[in-house]
Design a protein with these regions (language model features):
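Conserved catalytic/switch belt of AAA+ P-loop NTPases
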Residues: 131, 156-169
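P-loop/Walker A NTP-binding region and its immediately flanking N-terminal helices
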Residues: 1-153
Length: 169
């Protein structure tokens, strides 16, 4: 973990790095379990069972005061999830890590509303982004900044998506 350049972006925050590394490792285990379960189910001509007990939470909330690194932590976590290096979580060297850290990965949507109060339309934009299946990897990641500015109606509209995201989001 310490040699991984995506984690180097989290200056001096070993606790956050370890938490995100562990979560990304759980996500990889979940993908392997789903793949194995689907292969077994196909071999047995059954419907694949959903794997839920992986220890990986599909919705994350990064909190802290402005300037505390929330956006950087979210970007690093997104990079670890889309990293294509099978041996190193968040290697920072593969094309997917570089694209994620550079803000151009097709499976990462970064939404930064500029309004002081974020309404239902912006919440619907997040919901639509979360419903899209990943195109390059195993996970679709939506980073939605300034969620503390959501109106009550917008927060309610977004709640179900946050509580019950699609399988690979």
């Amino acid at each position: 973990m310490t040699n991984s350049s995506v984690f180097d972006s989290l200056a001096g925050s070993k606790t956050v790095s370890k938490t995100l590394f562990d979560a990304a490792s759980s996500a990889r285990a979940l993908v392997r379990a789903r793949t194995t379960e689907r292969a077994r189910a196909r071999a047995e001509h059954q419907n694949p069972a959903m794997i839920h007990d992986s220890g990986f939470a599909q919705s994350w909330l990064f909190t802290g005061p402005p300037g505390s690194g929330r956006s950087v932590a979210a970007k690093v976590f997104a990079a670890t999830l889309v990293c294509s290096n099978p041996d190193v979580v968040g290697c920072g060297q593969c094309e997917d890590c570089r694209a994620a850290m550079g803000g151009s990965h097709p499976d990462i949507e970064h939404i930064v509303p500029q309004q002081l109060s974020i309404g239902v339309d912006a919440a619907r934009e997040v919901i639509k982004a979360a419903a899209v299946s990943p195109v390059a990897g195993n996970w679709r990641v939506v980073i939605f900044e300034n969620a503390d500015r959501l109106t009550m109606q917008a927060a309610n509209a977004l709640l179900k998506t946050v509580e019950e995201p699609t399988e690979s989001t």
